[in-house]
Regions:
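A short, acidic, amphipathic alpha-helical segment used as a generic capping/interface helix at domain edges
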Residues: 247-263
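NAD(P)-dependent dehydrogenase/reductase Rossmann-like domain
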Residues: 169-170, 209, 248, 262, ...
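Non-catalytic positions within long, well-ordered alpha-helices that form the structural scaffold/packing
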Residues: 77, 178, 259-262
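FabD-like malonyl-/acyl-CoA
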Residues: 1-139, 184, 188, 265-293
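Glycine-rich phosphate/pyrophosphate-binding beta-alpha loops
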Residues: 61-63, 193, 248
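Short amphipathic alpha-helical segments
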Residues: 236, 240, 250-253, 274
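Alpha/beta catalytic cores of group-transfer enzymes, especially the acyltransferase/condensing modules
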Residues: 10-12, 39, 98-246
Length: 293
C-alpha cells in the first residue's frame, strides 16, 4: 500500500483532545509541555478539559488542533508515508510531521496565524457558506456574477464547496445558488472570510513570520492547498504557504492528485473524521482510517 497521511483543519476539535496521548507517552508529554511554554499559557488545560466553548476561540482552536495532530504523528511509531497533505490549518501540521519545519517553529507560526486571523475577522468582517450539490462550474459562475466580493474558498469534494467573502455578497450568492439548483446553502458559524482576499491583513502579518522561519526539505512530498501539487523544495513550500490564507483550498484536486500518484491508503491524523468523509466522496475505492488518540 502507498500511504498518505492527511491532517484536519479548524472545526475538528473536541473536549479532552490529546489527554490519553499525554498520559500514555512520555515523548508526547514533553512536546505538549513545550507547547505550553511556547504559547505562554497552559493550552493543554483547555484541550484536556470538558468545555467545548473554551476550545472555540481561534487563538486556542488552531494551536490545539496542530498540537494534537503533530504530537500524534510524531509519537505513535508511524512509518514515513509516501506523501502528506493537510486541509487549511492542517497544512502546517503536515509540514511539521514531515519535517519541513520543527515542531516549535511550526507552532509559533500557527499561533501567529491564529492571532492574525482573529484580528482580521474583527477589522474586516466577512462570512462563509457551504454550497451542497451544485456543479463547481456553476458555483464559480454565480460567485463571479455577484455584486460584492465572494469566491469559492474550499473545494472540499465534488458535492461540497465553501464560498467566502463580504457578508452581503455571500448572502446574495447563497440565494442565487439555491435558484440555480443547490440542495442547500448553509451559512457557517465564522466571523471572517477565510481563504479570500479579505484575509490580506492576516496574510501580511503571517508572511513576516514565515519569512523568518527556517524550512528544510520534508521526508516526503507535501501536497499543498494552493496548487494541489506535491512539493519538496523548501522555497516552493514557503512560497505556497505565503499564499494560503488568501487563496482557495483545492482539497478535491489534492486528493485526486495523490490517488493519481499512487496513494491507496489515507490515514487522517488528528481530531475528527471530516477528511475521511471527504476522501470517501472523492476517491471511494481507497482505504481510509483515522488516528485520533
Amino acid at each position: 500500500m502507498s500511504k498518505a497521511y492527511i491532517f484536519p483543519g479548524q472545526g475538528s476539535q473536541f473536549p479532552g483532545m490529546g489527554k490519553a496521548l499525554y498520559e500514555r507517552s512520555a515523548e508526547a508529554r514533553e512536546l505538549m509541555d513545550r507547547a505550553n511554554e511556547i504559547l505562554g499559557f497552559p493550552i493543554t488545560d483547555i484541550m484536556f478539559g470538558e468545555s467545548a466553548e473554551d476550545l472555540k476561540a481561534t487563538r486556542v482552536t488552531q494551536p490545539a488542533i496542530f498540537i494534537h495532530s503533530v504530537v500524534l504523528a510524531l509519537c505513535s511509531g508511524l512509518e514515513t508515508p509516501a506523501m502528506v497533505a493537510g486541509h487549511s490549518l492542517g497544512e502546517f501540521s503536515a509540514l511539521a510531521a514531515a519535517g519541513a519545519m520543527s515542531f516549535e517553529d511550526a507552532l509559533k507560526l500557527v499561533a501567529v496565524r491564529a492571532s492574525a486571523m482573529q484580528k482580521c475577522c474583527e477589522q474586516v468582517p466577512g462570512s462563509m457558506a457551504a454550497i451542497i450539490k451544485l456543479p463547481t462550474e456553476t458555483i464559480e459562475e454565480v460567485c463571479a456574477s455577484c455584486s460584492g466580493l465572494v469566491i469559492p474558498a474550499n473545494y472540499n469534494s465534488e458535492g461540497q464547496v465553501v464560498i467566502s467573502g463580504e457578508a452581503e455578497a455571500v448572502a446574495e450568492a447563497c440565494k442565487k445558488m439555491m435558484e440555480a439548483g443547490a440542495k442547500r446553502a448553509l451559512p457557517l458559524p465564522v466571523s471572517g472570510a477565510f481563504h479570500s482576499p479579505l484575509m490580506e491583513p492576516a496574510r501580511l502579518e503571517l508572511a513576516e513570520a514565515i519569512d523568518k522561519t527556517p524550512f528544510q526539505a520534508p521526508a516526503c512530498p507535501v501536497y499543498q492547498n494552493v496548487t494541489a501539487l506535491p512539493a519538496t523544495d523548501p522555497d516552493v513550500i514557503k512560497a505556497n504557504l505565503l499564499k494560503q490564507l488568501t487563496s482557495p483550498v483545492r482539497w478535491t484536486q489534492t486528493v485526486q492528485n495523490m490517488v493519481a500518484d499512487g496513494a491507496d491508503y489515507f490515514l487522517e491524523i488528528g481530531p475528527g473524521t471530516v477528511l475521511q468523509g471527504l476522501v470517501g466522496r472523492i476517491a471511494p475505492d481507497v482505504v481510509k482510517e483515522g488516528l485520533s488518540e
